[in-house]
Amino acid sequence: PRNLSIAATEVGAKLVHVSTDYVFAGDGTRPYVEYDTPAPISAYGRSKYEGEKFVQQFANRYFIVRTAWLYGDGKNFVKTMLKLSETHDELFVVDDQVGSPTSAVELAKMIHFLEPTENYGLFHATCEGDTNWADFTEEIFKRAGIRTKVNHVTSEEYARMNPASAKRPAYSILEDFMLKLTTDYRMADWHDALDVYMKEMGY
């Protein structure tokens, strides 16, 4: 991010930097807004936050876009659950981690909207609404016509069953506050975005 920011400034280009909810501790009780102070608890989160600061320091015309629970092309949660359902009659999925599933297509649309403007700064961009991983899995299976049972477990229970699993933030809900405050653009509801994604995969 540092070198990109310097290069963008030297040639007068705009810079779009995509960041993450991991810059926050994940212990919130209300949706995080852009004015909330980051407090990353993982190496990944700290790295992303440092990247944001480099952009703010060295770039003149920038859009920092934080998103969460992203899925699209390549490996992602939706495809992982569909794959697991092929070999499992039941799955154990946490229900005490909450966030807003966000389609990469919807994120790209938002960036495409922002990029031609001079509305620079920091933005949160997640699909509207929120859920937990277990309920999200059930919505995926419902759309795919899959009958694999989803057992709801706590993060603590899941960690005991899968000691090597990475720790994730308990609370990942980002409020698209600046987007709503400064533009008339609205992200799609996560259910609708998931419908489109699943249909594109043939479900």
Question: Where in the sequence are the language-model features?
Answer:
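Short aromatic/basic micro-patch
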Residues: 64, 101, 130, 152, ...
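NAD(P)-dependent short-chain dehydrogenase/reductase
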Residues: 53-99, 105-106, 112
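Catalytic helix-loop patch of NAD(P)-dependent Rossmann-fold dehydrogenases
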Residues: 14, 23-65
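Mid/C-terminal beta-alpha module of Rossmann-like enzyme folds, strongest
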Residues: 110, 117-164, 190
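Glycine-rich Rossmann NAD(P)(H)-binding loop
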Residues: 93-98, 123-130, 182
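NAD(P)-cofactor binding segment of oxidoreductase domains
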Residues: 1-16
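Helix C-cap/helix->beta junction micro-motif
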Residues: 10-11, 58, 144
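Conserved C-terminal active-site "lid" loop/helix of NAD(P)H-dependent oxidoreductases
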Residues: 132-138, 156-202
